[in-house]
Amino acid sequence: MSYSGKIESRMHPFLRWAGGKKWLVRKIISSFDVSQFSSYHEPFVGGGAMLFYFQPNNAYISDSNEQLIQTYITVRNSIDDVIEVIRGFGRTEDDYYFVRGLQTDDSVVRAAKFIYLNQLSYNGIYRVNSKGGYNVPWGKRVNYQFDFENLTKVSNYLQGVQIDSMDFEDCIDNVHQNALVFLDSPYTHSKILNGFIQYNQKVFTEEDQSRLSYLIDRIKERGAYYILTNADHPRIKEIFDKHDNVIPISRSSGIGGKNAQRGEYEECIFTNTNLTL
């Protein structure tokens, strides 16, 4: 797998997303050779920091968040129309709540709405109510300027990317020998708080963590490679004990919008690659 020759290296994620991995990209982009792998798979794509900075040619991305994935697909297929709709949205508080309340089946308007709310909401949180409606308040970003040039680059790159909405375990169908699977699943809290965390849309339970562990076993059985980012939590270390490389990391984080969840986080990278930090 090689880097895409079509896209400039300055392309970056077009969405803000809790748990994003820009910090990891900065640490490894100069030393980790993604081109050594035959394909790239990201079943928790979120904001796609790894995808957009490394820009692998043979890439498969997915997520269980259907609205997120439909936004990716529409950005790929109809970027000019998406940009035109975003340009028509205002920037005031009233404009924000008008857009938030829009109900439409038009895929272009839905994608434009998703991007608009993501960038102008409070902290870029993805949160929905019991009816599936986005309910994050205005973020007071009156002077925010959308980067339409970057959106166009993203669209061009996504032309060669397989995009699906599905459960993370189903990604195994496309994983073959010498593939790389990047697993950025939702985290537990730190070991001090000793609980499981909910951000974006759904709780990622201990049962889900066990399913993820089984997926890693299947990845390795196929002669492929994985990089898993997760919390430095005793139970997590037990679940993902594969006798592979475990790299501890301590860094500041601000998941979501609650001050109680901001501060120093202890994390781990689990991998059977030659990744070093």
Where do the model's predicted regions map?
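Conserved acidic-Pro-Pro-aromatic motif
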Residues: 178-269
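SAM-dependent nucleic-acid methyltransferase catalytic core
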Residues: 2-24, 30-34, 76-197, 211, ...
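Flexible, glycine-/basic-rich loop-and-beta segments that form/coincide
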Residues: 274-277
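Short, glycine/acidic-enriched loop or turn micro-motifs at the edges of active sites
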Residues: 45, 66, 170, 187, ...
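Conserved S-adenosyl-L-methionine
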Residues: 31, 37-91
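Short, well-ordered beta-strand micro-motif
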Residues: 116, 269-272
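Short loop/helix-cap segments at secondary-structure boundaries that form the rim of catalytic
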Residues: 51-56, 173-175, 236-242
